[in-house]
């Protein structure tokens, strides 16, 4: 059986099917049939309808939103990421259910 080159002889659905599955050794006709069976499934139709252009446009970050995100990242300090504990702070040993009196000694023994 002669294999067709999908990028020239097949429909875009067949090319999409072969690209998604990695099965490039299919004939153009067989790939088109498989793609048709996938794309005609009600769940697939519903998903494709939900992913129309308007939905995709909403997913793209605008220039102002990008600038806002980058500003937040640039203004982040170490205190926003790490909580620094001092030896005078009250801490609780969760396993034992007791407050730690001497933090330096407790860290060495647990």
UniProtKB/Swiss-Prot annotation:
User: What are the GO MF terms of this UniProt record?
Assistant: DNA binding; nuclease activity
Q: Determine if Translocase is one of this entry's keywords.
A: no
Can you tell which superkingdom this protein's organism belongs to?
Answer: Viruses
Kindly state which keywords UniProt assigns to this record, in alphabetical order. Answer: DNA-binding, Hydrolase, Nuclease, Viral genome packaging, Viral release from host cell
* DNA-binding region in chain numbering: 12-31, 27-46
Its biological function? Answer: This protein may possess the specific endonuclease activity required for cleavage at the pac site.
Q: What is this protein called?
A: Putative packaging signal terminase
Organism, by scientific name, is Vibrio phage CP-T1
Provide the taxonomic classification.
Viruses, Duplodnaviria, Heunggongvirae, Uroviricota, Caudoviricetes
């Amino acid at each position: 059986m002669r294999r067709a080159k999908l990028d020239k002889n097949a429909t875009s659905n067949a090319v999409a099917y072969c690209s998604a599955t990695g099965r490039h050794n299919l004939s153009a006709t067989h790939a088109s049939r498989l793609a048709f069976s996938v794309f005609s499934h009600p769940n697939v139709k519903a998903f494709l309808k939900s992913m129309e252009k308007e939905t995709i446009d909403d997913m793209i970050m605008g220039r102002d939103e990008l600038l806002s995100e980058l500003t937040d990242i640039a203004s982040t300090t170490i205190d926003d990421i790490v909580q620094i504990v001092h030896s005078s702070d009250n801490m609780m040993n969760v396993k034992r259910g007791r407050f730690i009196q001497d933090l330096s000694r407790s860290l060495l023994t647990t």
